[in-house]
Amino acid sequence: MKKTVQKIPSTMSTQHPDNANPAYWCNKSFISTADEIEEAFVAFSELGCDEYMWDWEGKFVDEAVIDKLYRRYTDYFLKHPLGKDKFLTYRVPNIWEERGYRLARAFINIITSADLAFDMGAKTPPIIEVILPMTKSAEQIMHTEKTFRKVAKLKEEIFENEATKSFDRIDVIPLIEQVEDLTRADKIIEDYLKMYKKEYGSYPKYMRPFIARSDPALNAGLIPAVLASKAAISHYAKLAKKYNVPMYPII
């Protein structure tokens, strides 16, 4: 198995899950959009999380998150750069389930955030992966990647910036959320690997398939959800060996 050079996050946090008590860092039971910037920073700096999932799909989030993180906590993020040491990963809208204008906004945000990060002295784009919820096919993963490339190239044609000229690709993390889709996750990922090889001439350096737990359990029950998750993990292990592509499932 080839070695992955890119750091792989081992712990992920997301915006204020249900808590029994008010958050210790703000002592409030309701976390506003304005508070979420500090929440992300606390997850990184105090709780030691490697990755923070920023929910562009299901929430109206602060779209200036990268700007505010770098400007408020400049020293920390220059020492622990986003996209290299710490990771902010957008969960973007699935255009097969909802309208695409929020995806367009997310992609423009990702691209322009790279401009900002480089201007602040960072050496890497702050966002290098996005999570695609409700993934059902390899075509959806590849289409999302290609759409980002189109947006990035259009932005470069209009607003030239040498620092981010090569930033025109982003990796997509497929979040598979239905039991029936998890049981055939090997087909989804294998089809994607073949598409990727055809498009780029080689296989991806690694993949981070995301296994949902709450939705499968809610829709199909606990036992089917657990069995489907185990099946998906087994599928990914076999695909990793078959194609020599490291798999790092998120669950």
Predicted regions located by residue number:
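Short, well-ordered, mixed-charge alpha-helical segments that flank or form enzyme active sites
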Residues: E98-R99, A138-I141, E180-R184, P216-A220
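Aromatic-enriched hydrophobic runs in primary sequence
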Residues: F30-I31, W54-D67, D75-F77, K136-A138, ...
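Core alpha/beta catalytic barrel or barrel-like domain that forms the active/cofactor pocket
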Residues: D85-N94, D119-K136, I158-E177, Y200-I223, ...
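Well-ordered, non-membrane alpha-helical segments in soluble/globular domains
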Residues: D62-T74, L103-L116, I141-L154, A185-M195, ...
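Alpha/beta catalytic barrel-like cores
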Residues: M1-I128, M134, K150-K153
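Active-site capping/gating regions of soluble enzymes
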Residues: K2-T14, F118, D186-I251
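Alpha-helix termini
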Residues: F77-H80, A114-A122, R149-T164, L193-S202, ...
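Short, well-structured alpha-helical patches and their helix-loop capping segments
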Residues: A106, L132, K136, Q140, ...
